[in-house]
Amino acid sequence: VSHVTVPSEGVMPSPLSLCRYLPRELSPSVDSRSCSIPLVAPRKAGKLFLGTTPPRAPGLPRRLAWFSIDWEQVCLMHRLGSGGFGSVYKATYHGVPVAIKQVNKCTEDLRASQRSFWAELNIAGLRHDNIVRVVAASTRTPEDSNSLGTIIMEFGGNVTLHQVIYDATRSPEPLSCRKQLSLGKCLKYSLDVVNGLLFLHSQSILHLDLKPANILISEQDVCKISDFGCSQKLQVLRGRQASPPHIGGTYTHQAPEILKGEIATPKADIYSFGITLWQMTTREVPYSGEPQYVQYAVVAYNLRPSLAGAVFTASLTGKALQNIIQSCWEARGLQRPSAELLQRDLKAFRGTLG
């Protein structure tokens, strides 16, 4: 969709919360706030840590081991990417490959930066094959560092699903990462992601920024959901009587209720998955045009990416895939399937392929 026609002001009030508008035009592959791990990696890494190393963390019980960093065991290798909210590095920790995320202290929105840091820790202590695990974290930083906190995460892989979908012909990665997504591969990755969502929702955690750029693909070809800087705990949201807290994310993947400023539910992640599955299937960008117009049309006119392509209409399998995607991005959250039901439907669909 290149242009969206929206009635002028005065015809009808905007269904969007005023605070949801973006401050500037962004590409659909970029977040509406920069809490996500950066997509673009610089060619050269600068000096990684400044000043002296913080004191070695005291011994902690195993169940609290993630809550402190043994700085003597950190060996930084190179920068993976950087953005307004910080930098991500590849490193080793106790000899094991990891990714280290440092959240900047001096940013345009310090409070949002702090929220992003603590949101990343919503999954601390949790383990699942399709979730990037938090290994350790600390608010202690080197004395001269510009960081308000450091998070050590499982190294989920060098490649994101976004790169596989859009950069296949230009990627310098091995051939195994550059081949096109077959229907079987698309369903395999989809089940990986849904399995991760099912686990998160069982732990009362909402991701709220699910998109291909936040899905890593490991060397074992397993998808892992990453970047929890926009995540929320469900019990916290349910306990709020007033307006919900500000939720970041990516406007192209946000459910209508999120764009309207309503309190999030697990069905918001299901909507985001529907857009992601559409991207895997078509290898196209969801929307183009002014973000605020797209947001308005998604809410007021039920705008969605096109399902008219031959990939959806030329075969029975395509039509079945079309039905799954449509069910995920229904306007009302109650009409969307749960992660459990979606997992069952995807497994049944994969079974029909033989």
UniProtKB/Swiss-Prot annotation:
The active site is at D209 (proton acceptor). InterPro entries: Kinase-like_dom_sf, Prot_kinase_dom, Protein_kinase_ATP_BS, Ser/Thr_kinase_AS, Ser/Thr_Kinases-Pseudokinases. It catalyses: L-seryl-[protein] + ATP = O-phospho-L-seryl-[protein] + ADP + H(+); L-threonyl-[protein] + ATP = O-phospho-L-threonyl-[protein] + ADP + H(+). ATP binds at L80, G81, S82, G83, G84, F85, G86, S87, V88, K101. It is an enzyme of class 2 (transferase). Residues 74-350 form the Protein kinase domain. GO terms for molecular function: ATP binding; protein serine kinase activity; protein serine/threonine kinase activity. It holds the Pfam family Pkinase. Keywords: ATP-binding, Kinase, Nucleotide-binding, Oncogene, Serine/threonine-protein kinase, Transferase. Gene3D superfamilies: Phosphorylase Kinase, domain 1, Transferase(Phosphotransferase) domain 1. Its EC number is 2.7.11.1. It comes from the Viruses. This protein is probably translated as a Gag-Mos polyprotein. Belongs to the protein kinase superfamily. Ser/Thr protein kinase family. This is Serine/threonine-protein kinase-transforming protein mos. It comes from Moloney murine sarcoma virus (strain ts110).
